[in-house]
Design a protein with these regions (language model features):
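Catalytic-core regions of core metabolic enzymes
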Residues: 1-692, 748-752
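Long, intrinsically disordered low-complexity tandem-repeat segments
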Residues: 693-735, 739
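Short, cationic low-complexity segments
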Residues: 737-738, 742-752
């Protein structure tokens, strides 16, 4: 496919404007054998033949790659002809397949059948092609791609258009391309196939990955993990807009395909970026410099202009990158090289750079606390030559650095070319430098994580029982996993509820009363949760309200049942869930409890199974992690306890019957005494559940819908909310609610 001896274009044309003509022009510089086929208008005298067999007979060398520039209806026959003539790979450019309805699906099926029968590998359909500048091969209907410089960065993109756009952007940033592939519909060759190919490709130093759909999540993750062990991968995932899709629980609503794909790629070791500009900056750096694995690399900054240096320092600090103060010995050495009024602790402000600039760079880079150096300087007249200074300082692979050069375009381009030739990444602004620094540090941190293969599920873990569980049953199951829950009593009658109240409401302790029914998923939305019950009269009023609920489809054999439960202490509420993702398999999600989690999108996701140690790091990814570390005198999360609970939940899902789609604890409250599960939901596919007033019965597991990005679960009606209670001044329960117990009412999280 990517290193053919010869290429044949089927559907070639001499008419300008035709796809086949553009492809023929793109291949003009290919050094191997070339042949053109046009069954309708053959011109043997002009080198255009009626069939691949005829073309092969008149061509020196083997034709390995067939490029199909024919309509969808003719692709299967053309592919079969190419395979019969000895071609081993094919590029199908046409659209009009699966995306075009039933007729297009038939064309796609016909292509698959030919590929399966003959063994020919197929890239596409619906792609603008690929290019391999190192081999002089441009199999693209964008002839300008033939002018891309050869280099060591590979691009693997879902879209042929994005493949070209990224390659041109990378070239504009002073980079060269080893391979650029647009996957298109991915009927046969997928991104995972290309990534596996690149593992052993000596001409590729780093890989840029763009994803829209993932046909096989576990295979993609395995390919990225293997590739990252050899060379860095920078990934951009499309599909942020699907975060608003509804699902049956917070876990489903939060573990969207976009979030899950990004989390899976991070867990595999890729550096995940937010946009194409950041991708270009990241890969520009990582293709030249890769820090040793390090849990927390230190950044040193040397700037010849204070303002831009401060921009870089400010952004790096916001990214959580450590900027250590330089040692006393380093500062003493800098003091002998710089004017007395300059700042010399880190960042180092040199003032207008002079003849000592190279020595300043070398001294700062040699500081034992500095693992990476970032440099900023303008190309001022009669000032320092930045590229020469960087090389004189020994910056490069042995002394990792990124250099930002500002100034007129021509001057910057000249400096950048020299720096890149020396193996030093050159950027053109503080933001680009910060992107590069973050990528280098992220890559080092991820490789420093304990290299544990995906752990096996604990064989001793008990799975969820086959039948649907109500809240009491779900909490009892959590108890078998060692997860603490409030003291409670399940009651079949009002009399039992009163006896439970007398037992639990000791010393003025208030209780919660809830409807108990496995068919009701979101109890508060139908008035099925009553909090802060302190007297028998209040209990009767609560029971009356629950008895008045209509249309809930109660599954209780004797009618309405109740759960009477002790109120929990105040604390900070989390959501923790394990679910089956349709693309990546089992995943675990953690975030703030309640609707705030969905609104803020502040979640951490991991593929499961996972070790308690890996799960323990999840809360540290949350933007609101300060709430878990004793905010204003509040409770402190024991990471080890959290890791044990999360890993246990993942193991429980794996040990459960296939129809158990999800296990969720929301809220999982952090209190002074540790974690306690205040509510639990176990979702079975095909089980009937109630979703709020007037919602009727909705069936879970109704199917999978495509959001235009990674596949995501079909949306249910609503997701459970939940108040977040925290220490005074942080997150508080809504007015009129009893602090310290779950509620599905929306909470104001402005102070959080």
């Amino acid at each position: 496919m990517f290193a053919p001896s010869g290429v044949v274009v089927i559907g070639a044309s001499r008419q300008s404007g035709k796809l086949g003509a553009a492809m023929a022009r793109s291949l003009a510089a290919f050094p191997g054998s070339r042949a053109l086929v046009n069954a309708r208008r053959p011109e043997p005298a002009e080198g255009v033949y009626a069939s691949v067999t005829e073309a092969a007979a008149h061509t020196d060398g083997r034709l390995d790659l067939a490029i199909l520039c024919v309509p969808a209806a003719g692709c299967a026959d053309a592919l079969a002809e190419a395979a019969a003539a000895g071609c081993r790979a094919a590029l199908v450019c046409a659209g009009g397949f699966g995306e075009a309805g039933p007729e297009g699906e038939q064309y796609a099926d016909a292509l698959r059948q030919v590929a399966d029968r003959t063994g020919i590998r197929l890239l596409g359909p619906n792609t603008s092609g690929f290019f391999a500048p190192q081999r002089g091969l441009t199999a693209s209907f964008v002839p300008a791609a033939a002018h891309l410089p050869a280099g060591d960065i590979a691009v693997v993109a879902a879209s042929g258009g994005v493949n070209h756009a990224l390659a041109f952007d990378l070239a504009d940033a002073g980079n060269g391309i080893s391979l650029g592939v647009g996957i298109g519909a991915g009927l046969d060759v997928t991104a995972a196939d290309v990534l596996e190919h690149l593992i052993a490709d000596a001409g590729t130093a780093a890989v840029a990955l763009h994803l829209e759909t993932v046909p096989d999540g576990p295979r993609l993750v395995a390919a990225v993990r293997r590739l990252v062990a050899a060379k860095p991968v920078v990934a951009l995932v499309v599909g942020r807009s699907d975060v608003g899709d509804f699902a049956r629980s917070h876990t489903g609503a939060l573990a969207t395909s976009w979030r899950t794909a990004r989390a899976a790629l991070r867990q595999a070791g890729a550096v995940v970026v937010d946009d194409e500009r950041e991708l270009v900056d990241a890969i520009t750096a990582l293709s030249r410099v890769r820090l040793p694995a390090h849990a927390d690399p230190g950044l040193g900054i040397v700037t010849a202009q204070a303002g831009p240096g401060l921009l870089l320092a400010d952004r790096s600090a916001a990214d959580g990158i450590r900027m250590p103060e330089l040692t006393e010995a380093t500062q003493d050495a800098l003091g002998g090289l710089l004017p007395p009024l300059t700042y010399q602790r880190n960042p180092v402000d040199t003032g207008r750079p002079g003849e000592t600039f190279a020595r300043v760079l070398g001294v700062t880079a040699a500081d034992p606390a500095v693992d990476l150096l970032a440099v900023y300087a303008l190309t001022e007249p009669d000032s320092v030559d930045v590229a020469s200074a960087a090389q004189d300082a020994g910056l490069g692979a042995d002394s990792p650095a990124v250099v930002v050069v500002g100034g007129p375009h021509e001057d910057v381009a000249e400096q950048r070319a020299r720096l890149h030739k020396a193996g030093i990444p050159a950027l053109t602004g503080p933001t680009s430098a910060a992107n590069a620094v973050r990528a280098l540090v992220t890559d080092a941190r991820q490789r420093a994580r304990v290299a544990v293969a995906r752990v096996a599920t604990d064989p001793g873990t008990t799975g969820v029982p086959g039948s649907p569980l109500d809240e009491d049953g779900a909490k009892t199951f959590l108890g078998t996993l060692g997860i603490r829950t409030p003291e409670r009593v399940a009651c079949d009658t009002r009399e039992e509820a009163h006896r439970a109240f007398e037992r639990l409401a000791v010393g003025g302790q208030s209780v919660a009363v809830k409807v108990l029914d496995a068919a009701i998923l979101h109890k508060t939305e139908i008035g099925g949760v009553r909090l802060g019950i302190r007297t028998p009269a209040e209990l009767d009023a609560a029971l009356d309200a629950i008895d008045a609920i209509d249309g809930t489809g109660s599954t209780a054999p004797g009618g309405r049942r109740y759960l009477v439960e002790a109120m929990a202490p105040t604390g900070v509420d989390l959501v923790l869930g394990a679910r089956h993702d349709p693309v990546f398999g089992p995943v675990v999600l953690a975030g703030l409890g309640g609707t705030a989690a969905e609104a803020l999108a502040d979640v951490a996701i991991r593929l499961a199974p996972l070790s308690p140690a890996e799960a323990a790091a999840m809360p540290d990814e949350l933007a609101a992690r300060a709430l878990l570390d004793g905010w204003r005198g509040g409770p402190v999360l024991d990471r080890a306890e959290f890791g044990r609970v999360a890993a246990a939940l993942a193991d429980a899902l794996a040990a459960s019957p296939p129809d158990v789609a999800e296990i969720e604890i929301n809220p999982l409250r952090l209190t002074a005494d540790g974690l306690i599960a205040l509510d639990a939901v176990i979702v079975h596919t095909g089980a009937a559940t109630v979703h709020g007033t007037g919602a009727g019965i909705e069936h879970t597991g109704a199917g999978i819908e495509h959001t235009g990005a990674i596949t995501a679960p079909a949306g249910a009606v609503t997701a459970p909310a939940g108040a977040v209670t925290a220490p005074a001044g942080a997150v508080t329960a809504p007015a009129g609610e009893e602090p310290g117990q779950e509620t599905d009412k929306e909470t104001d999280h402005a102070q959080a």
